[in-house]
Amino acid sequence: MPTKLELYFGTGICLKNYYDGEIYDSAKTPLLDQPVTIFDGPTDTLILQQGEEVCEQERLAVKKVFVTPNGETVLDFGQNMTGYVELFVNAKAGDCVDLSFAEVMDKEGNFYTENYRGAKAQYHYICSDGVQTWHPSLTFYGFRYIRINDF
């Protein structure tokens, strides 16, 4: 066991969940000043997950932007897919980009997420100053539509 080990890390990730999404604060990076806690991990044998690796196949652009009868701004990618969205923004520190994902619209043409069975399927990106690019590091969804909740 080391006696004078000092490890530090920093990240903008505030919350990360496979189904619910990611909250990322870009003003917190790259701060490598948070002490790391060393602890005894599990002793169970790890088993490799079987199946295809998830990797990017192609990039798609938004096909249409529209406003729903409820007054929500929605981006339509023209097809249902599995993926993530990469943000390109020019913003001020503290500005927030808040997006929700859906596969279908309801019969009135409004944003619909009930089929996600409780998964939030959202990105919350807190901006730093200037031009920035970001995409989540763990989360991806099945979606066709993105609702812009805040920007």
Per-segment meaning from a language model:
Residues 1-151:
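Extracellular/oxidizing-compartment recognition motifs
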